[in-house]
Amino acid sequence: MVFLPLSAQADLSDMSRIFRQTPSLSAFEVCYGGGCAEVKSLALTSDDWQKVADIFANSDINSVNPQQERQLIAKGIAQLETIIGEKIGTSNDLAGTFFEGHLSGQLDCNDEAINTTTYMRLMRQAGFIKWHEIEDTRTRNFFFNGWPHSTAVIRDSKSSTRFAVDSWFYDNGAPPVIVPFKEWKAGYRPADTPIDRPKNASKQTQTH
């Protein structure tokens, strides 16, 4: 089940291809515009990646437990969103989808779920993620304004507990929420999400 609130031109084949890619620092693709309506191929420089590595280097990776690792994953995703947003013009991506679909550089939950999965795969390839497996995206039948909602998912390798990793609830560059998947599936929504803010509260006001 796929929802396409931002653009009617989303390409399901692109969504599948990008989700199934084997990303590397020298070549990977990201989505935006709603359901991968826009796709960018890019690479990360050594300076870019060092910003992510520094997040994990500031902790003793050998003593990190699954809970601590989830906190680091969230910080790593936030850093990658910031870096990539500057490269492809999504720095002004706002939380949610409902009020900002007319603005440039916006992501729906499908874009967020796919990109977040890609970012976590890059971190796992680098050896930063040791306590979790990266799973397929999931969709829940809890509707926001008539639309289903998707998320990236990880699984704790020790306990087998699944966690939703949801970047959609906050603006670009903010850490995603990471909550038990069962809680997310039941309709979890963080109390501090700005997704219901009025249009005049957006940090980007010019339409394109």
What are these regions (language model features)?
Residues F163-H208:
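His-Asp-centered catalytic microenvironments across diverse enzyme cores
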Residues M1-P5:
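Bacterial N-terminal signal peptides
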Residues R121-K182:
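Hydrophobic/aromatic-rich core segments of domains that either
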Residues A8-A10:
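Boundary at the C-terminal end of the N-terminal hydrophobic targeting segment
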Residues D14-R17:
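Anionic, Ser/Thr-rich low-complexity intrinsically disordered regions
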Residues R70-H132:
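Mid-length scaffold segments of soluble, non-membrane domains
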Residues C31-Q67, T90-H102:
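Acidic/histidine-rich, surface-exposed loop or edge segments in extracytoplasmic proteins
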